[in-house]
Swiss-Prot record:
GO terms for molecular function: antigen binding. Transmembrane segments: none annotated. GO terms for cellular component: extracellular region; immunoglobulin complex. This is Ig heavy chain V region H8. This chain was isolated from a myeloma protein that binds phosphorylcholine. Residues 1-114 form the Ig-like domain. The keyword Transcription does not apply. Keywords: Adaptive immunity, Immunity, Immunoglobulin. It comes from Mus musculus. It holds the Pfam family V-set.
Length: 123
């Protein structure tokens, strides 16, 4: 069974930092692109970061809203995806999800999602 389990959310003051984790199991972690997506209260899902697979040297990509503040990384020995979040702002308040990126039927889609972890940025 493929599983993604996020953790590390919580309440943090503006300007603070948090590190989210996404523990994965049931698939070969190094073979897949992995993504971080968030949903602010009352808003749509927003893609924020990607970690490409081993074949693509685990290169990363970020949305403009988090670039320079957030860092996505992997622990390949433990099959964990991380999101280091720095200089947090009130607008970063959201439920954060990790997702597996899958290619099938000639297009890419997120086929497995975690349940999410909540981040609240407030003084």
């Amino acid at each position: 069974e493929v599983k993604l389990v996020e953790s590390g959310g919580g309440l943090v003051q503006p300007g603070g930092s948090l590190r989210l984790s996404c523990a994965t199991s049931g698939f070969t972690f190094s073979d897949f692109y992995m993504e971080w997506v968030r949903q602010p209260p009352g808003k749509r899902l927003e893609w924020i970061a990607a970690s490409r697979n081993k074949a693509n040297d685990y290169t990363t990509e970020y949305s403009a809203s988090v670039k320079g503040r957030f860092i996505v990384s992997r622990d390949t020995s433990q099959s964990i995806l991380y999101l280091q979040m720095n200089a947090l702002r009130a607008e970063d308040t959201a439920i954060y999800y990790c997702a597996r990126d899958y290619y099938g039927b000639s297009y890419w889609y997120f086929d497995v999602w975690g349940a999410g972890t909540t981040v609240t940025v407030s003084s």
